[in-house]
UniProtKB/Swiss-Prot annotation:
InterPro entries: Cucumo_2B. Belongs to the cucumovirus/ilarvirus protein 2b family. Keywords: Host nucleus, Host-virus interaction, Inhibition of host innate immune response by virus, Suppressor of RNA silencing, Viral immunoevasion. Its main location: host cell. A motif (Nuclear localization signal) lies at residues 22-27. Multifunctional protein that plays two independent roles: viral suppressor of host RNAi (VSR) and viral inducer of host attractiveness to insect vectors (VIA). Acts as a suppressor of RNA-mediated gene silencing, also known as post-transcriptional gene silencing (PTGS), a mechanism of plant viral defense that limits the accumulation of viral RNAs. May directly interfere with mobile silencing signaling. Also inhibits signal transduction by the phytohormone jasmonate, making the infected plant more attractive to aphids, which are the second host to play a role as a dissemination vector. This is Suppressor of silencing 2b. Homotetramer. Interacts with host AGO1; this interaction blocks AGO1 cleavage activity to attenuate RNA silencing and thus counter host defense. Interacts with host JAZ. It is found in: Host nucleus. GO terms for cellular component: host cell nucleus. One of its GO terms (biological process) is symbiont-mediated suppression of host innate immune response.
């Protein structure tokens, strides 16, 4: 019985050591990537979204930040952001305006 507990505790220690080595390796890998200035697409999107939150709504043009996104014709025909009125809930809504 004593030998079995020693083997189990040795295996537990070995597993804990392997997990710690993996954790350290991952941490240094992330640190090195940050030092190189690399950002994954999701990290880049999060940082851009964080910047968007600090800007006023009417000053943001998503095309400047996301040139790959193609705008639909209905979005391009909308009025500019400067003339946007938050109180007009049905502006640009064809169904509410009775166009069909």
């Amino acid at each position: 019985m004593d030998v079995l507990t020693v083997v189990v505790s040795t295996a537990d220690l070995h597993l804990a050591n392997l997990q710690e080595v993996k954790r350290r390796r991952r941490r240094s890998h992330v640190r090195n990537r940050r030092a190189r200035g690399y950002k994954s697409p999701s990290e880049r999107a999060r940082s851009i979204a964080r910047l968007f939150q600090m800007l006023p709504f009417h000053g943001v043009d998503p095309v400047d930040w996301f040139p790959d996104v193609v705008r639909s014709p209905s979005v391009t025909s909308l009025v500019s952001y400067e003339s946007f009125d938050d109180t007009d809930w049905f502006a640009g809504n064809e169904w509410a305006e009775g166009s069909f």
